[in-house]
């Protein structure tokens, strides 16, 4: 459990194509948002997952049915500074703009504090 207590930032490549296979056209972008939240919850172990507005723009930029096959994401586990917060940690997901997301591995990003 000690591993979940620390603040960390990692970059992931998430294959949206396999997560959205078989989803009807008008539900693809909303399903992509839900799948990204589910992915962040699984990999960071936090209930509270927040998406950056830029990520929402990236998902929706080609319309409701044109979600990119792969997305490169930077997921940060941060401390919740609010007073009576339900969860002590939350995950913040933002996009990483790369030419191609193919073949990239998961990396730990060193934060500049």
Swiss-Prot record:
It holds the Pfam family Ribosomal_L31e. The keyword ATP-binding does not apply. GO terms for biological process: cytoplasmic translation. PROSITE patterns: RIBOSOMAL_L31E. Keywords: Ribonucleoprotein, Ribosomal protein. One of its GO terms (molecular function) is structural constituent of ribosome. One of its GO terms (cellular component) is preribosome. InterPro entries: Ribosomal_eL31, Ribosomal_eL31_CS, Ribosomal_eL31_dom_sf. Belongs to the eukaryotic ribosomal protein eL31 family. This is Large ribosomal subunit protein eL31. It comes from Candida glabrata (strain ATCC 2001 / BCRC 20586 / JCM 3761 / NBRC 0622 / NRRL Y-65 / CBS 138) (Yeast).
